[in-house]
Amino acid sequence: MEGGGGGGGGGGGGGGGGGGGGAPYATRTAEEVFRDLRGRRAGMIKALTTDVEKFYKLCDPEKENLCLYGYPNETWEVTLPAEEVPPEIPEPALGINFARDGMNEKDWLALVAVHSDSWLLSVAFYFGARFGFDREARRRLFNMINNLPTIFEVVTGAAKKQAKEKTPNSSSKSNKPSSKVQSKAESRSKSKLSAPKDEEGSGDDEGEEEEDDHDNTLCGTCGTNDGKDEFWICCDNCEKWYHGKCVKITPARAEHIKQYKCPDCTNKRARA
């Protein structure tokens, strides 16, 4: 087994691509499966970017069929595939090391990235099937995944280019709608996400930046920014925004809520 980036701690060795310390089998919701995928994705991105020299050396073409695994704890590992048939979870691309010396390094890394993206999707929807996700849960899971840049886009630099083209004027807090600071009433979770009408004399640049803010805001439950003209509500604890329909809050009900806490924050407090 070839370890990389502390990967052995993530899966427990021996081609344990499904391991990750047993974390996948504790998941039950689309959001939990997404967190599992996000951790695996982060580990694989490390292998192909910050840890690329180590990854390159581990992928010796003289060795047997090797795979790149990503684990939920954001580590990675280059190792042999799982021995059990069928495997515990879908396996990543086999033999990534064989093409290393026959290709330009950037092209080879991009090829591994494409296969890694494919593997992440197969693992995510394997868990979706295992946990009996219905159509709505599968849709939420796909939308959350689709809102992330692919590994291929990160490795090739396409993700940075897209981000610059999409939000040239946005700040680091652009995922929060500017309507949140308009008034105390709106900051207490009653603001719709639709962009406020510009006052007379307001600059065009300001309006464009505000529009970018709205476009980048994702619902904390379904992971999409669909329905910008619908009612949205903000958690006063974690400051995440949610579709009212996703958290079962109506505008009328919100009028009587002094301080709104989302389901995640409510559950955390109950467990504590």
Curated annotation (Swiss-Prot):
The record marks 232, 236, 241 as: Histone H3K4me3 binding. Residues 1-23 have a biased composition (Gly residues). Belongs to the Alfin family. Histone-binding component that specifically recognizes H3 tails trimethylated on 'Lys-4' (H3K4me3), which mark transcription start sites of virtually all active genes. The keyword DNA-binding does not apply. PROSITE patterns: ZF_PHD_1 (PS01359), ZF_PHD_2 (PS50016). GO terms for biological process: chromatin organization; regulation of DNA-templated transcription. One of its GO terms (cellular component) is nucleus. It is found in: Nucleus. InterPro entries: Alfin (IPR045104), Alfin_N (IPR021998), PHD_AL_plant (IPR044104), Zinc_finger_PHD-type_CS (IPR019786), Znf_FYVE_PHD (IPR011011), Znf_PHD (IPR001965), Znf_PHD-finger (IPR019787), Znf_RING/FYVE/PHD (IPR013083). It comes from the Eukaryota. It holds the Pfam family PHD. Keywords: Chromatin regulator, Metal-binding, Nucleus, Transcription, Transcription regulation, Zinc, Zinc-finger. Residues 183-200 have a biased composition (Basic and acidic residues). This is PHD finger protein ALFIN-LIKE 6. Residues 1-24, 162-218 are annotated as: Disordered. Residues 168-182 have a biased composition (Low complexity). GO terms for molecular function: histone binding; transcription cis-regulatory region binding; transcription coregulator activity; zinc ion binding. Residues 201-214 have a biased composition (Acidic residues). The PHD-type zinc finger mediates the binding to H3K4me3.
